[in-house]
Regions:
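Disulfide-rich extracellular modules and peptides
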Residues: 80, 84-86, 94, 144, ...
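Consensus "Asn ladder" position of solenoid repeat domains
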Residues: 95, 116, 140, 163-166, ...
Length: 525
């Protein structure tokens, strides 16, 4: 059809022929009834020739898409309401689907069905998707009966399988060898089969946390032949001991929130690449660990044993350890010899234990030359631990029983940046005027919740934060705050200060508070 909407070429020619015929004599003869056979034949031949378009030179773009042009690919098939951003991707997430969608192309490589209400996956529909690499079924209502084991035999290219937050009670009996990531977290799984995760040479990450797995539900050969696994999460289950036969390739092992009371001898003897081990919130006792438990973990950097029943620091700690979390146990005394081997330790967390007056012997922490942060809050310590590492930057020990601060108690920690002695038993008479003199880099000092009746003398001029709320302060004079021109936050709430107890010009000393309008507290109680 012409682009201007005019008549077709053949129609135009027919009109011209008709007009020409009217100008010739033979139409007159026709009208008189004298047209012979020869004239009839000539007219018909002429009409046939003129109705056929002669070859012409087209001025149109040959690539212009015309109706019915077969050069354009047909539209891709995509399930109703889903999106198909690429030829190999089908995204049906969050559509409240109750049945497996129809019309999924066999060419699909990535299929997303998470956040729906699917209860089952039909075998005939799943098995035909043999090229599938990613199958995401996260957050549905799929039961073990609704997940056909046979279908996975056809999915020989599957690499990423996500079925977390469903209703599975057992893991699939078989998953393809091509698998790289398997996420079965937050189901009700009580049993894993030998070929669920075994014989998967490419498998790197397995997530089984928040299930109901006990040791009987994990066969000894669960991970046999899968020696590329680097991340294994078994947290929040019902395990009573470490599973045997863990892959030697592990780098992260999550076992927190179980019922583990014992780590069998040799259970961690092959995991020389393990960097992070999470065992918090279990039932570990001293007898459940021995000197060899952690001794072979030559790459271990992070060890969390908090919220257990330990009475001592574990033996055989690796030298590579950087973070040791022992909070909320029953530790009464720190064995210096056991800590000495972990010379690279940077963060030691001992909060909420039972450390008393002799809980930290003098020099017990001194070999930890790289120690950066020490958490001791919630114990029964009566003094600041003597002879601490020189590189210590943060000493956190609120809620203890410290009643005095001598002139040299903090002498070994000149590099402190944060000191928290809140909610102890400090009284002004027992805080030496030179107690803070050497702390020239201190930025945060928390003395809240003590029994101070006046500001301590000799506060470091480097301070940015000073917390003194919930004390017995009765006076505030300019000279007490002299030199604190970097102070940005001053908390004085819940003391015994009255308006007349604050000397003239007191706030003028605190230029940073005024210039930056920092949130200092002038509450006068």
């Amino acid at each position: 059809m012409p682009r201007d909407g005019g008549p077709l070429p053949s129609q135009q020619k027919l009109q011209e022929v008709t007009a020409s015929c009217k100008r010739k004599s033979w139409p007159t003869a026709w009208a008189r009834g004298r047209a012979g056979p020869a004239m009839w034949l000539g007219v018909l031949q002429l009409l046939l020739l003129l109705l056929v378009d002669p070859p012409t030179t087209s001025t149109e773009d040959p690539a212009f898409p015309h109706l019915g042009d077969s050069s354009q690919p047909p539209p891709r098939a995509c399930p109703w309401r889903c999106s198909c951003p690429r030829a190999d991707t089908v995204d049906c997430a969050g559509l409240d689907l109750k049945v497996f969608p129809d019309n999924i192309t066999k060419a699909v490589r990535h299929l997303s069905l998470q956040n729906n209400q699917l209860q089952e996956l039909p075998y005939n529909k799943l098995s035909r998707l043999s090229g599938l690499q990613t199958l995401d079924l996260h957050s549905n209502l799929i039961s073990s009966e609704g997940l056909p084991d046979e279908a996975f035999e056809s999915l020989t290219q599957l690499e990423h399988f996500y079925v977390a937050h469903n209703k599975l009670t057992v893991a699939p009996q078989f998953l393809p060898r091509s698998l790289r990531v398997a996420d079965l977290a937050a189901n009700e799984v009580v049993e894993v089969f030998p070929l669920t995760f075994a014989e998967k040479p490419l498998l790197r990450s397995v997530y089984l946390h928040n299930n109901q797995l006990s040791n009987t539900g994990l066969p000894p050969n669960t991970f046999r032949g899968s020696e590329a696994i680097t991340t294994l999460s078994l947290s929040s289950n019902q395990l009573s001991r470490l599973p045997p036969g863990l892959p030697a390739s592990l780098e992260q092992l999550h076992l927190q929130d179980n019922l583990i009371s014992k780590v069998p001898r040799g259970a961690l003897s092959r995991q020389t690449q393990l960097r992070e081990l999470y065992l918090q919130h279990n039932q570990l006792t001293d007898s459940g660990l021995d000197v060899t438990t952690f001794s072979k973990l030559h790459s271990l950097e992070y060890l969390d044993l908090s919220h257990n029943l330990l009475a001592t620091v574990p033996a055989g700690l690796p030298r590579t350890l950087a973070v040791l979390h022992l909070g909320r146990n029953c530790i009464r005394q720190v064995d210096a010899a056991r800590l000495r081997v972990a010379r690279g330790l940077r963060y030691l967390l001992l909060q909420h234990n039972e450390l008393g007056a002799s809980g930290l012997p003098a020099g017990a922490l001194q070999p930890l030359r790289s120690l950066h942060t020490l958490h001791l809050y919630g114990n029964r310590l009566q003094r600041v631990p003597p002879t601490m590492p020189r590189r210590l930057r943060a000493l956190i020990m609120p809620h203890n029983r410290v009643a005095a601060l001598g002139a040299r108690d903090l002498a070994s920690t000149r590099g402190l940046v944060e000191l928290n002695l809140a909610y102890n038993h400090l009284a002004s008479a027992r805080v030496h005027p030179r107690a803070f003199r050497r702390l020239r880099t201190l930025r945060s000092l928390d003395l809240a919740g003590n029994q101070l009746s006046r500001l301590p003398a000799g506060l470091p001029t480097s301070l940015h934060e000073l917390r003194l709320q919930h004390n017995h302060l009765r006076a505030l004079e300019p000279e007490m705050l002299a030199g604190l021109d970097q102070l940005r936050e001053l908390s004085l709430a819940h003391n015994q200060l009255r308006v007349g107890d604050i000397g003239p010009g007191t706030w003028h000393e605190l230029q940073a508070l005024q210039d930056q309008q920092a949130p200092y507290d002038k509450h006068l109680g």
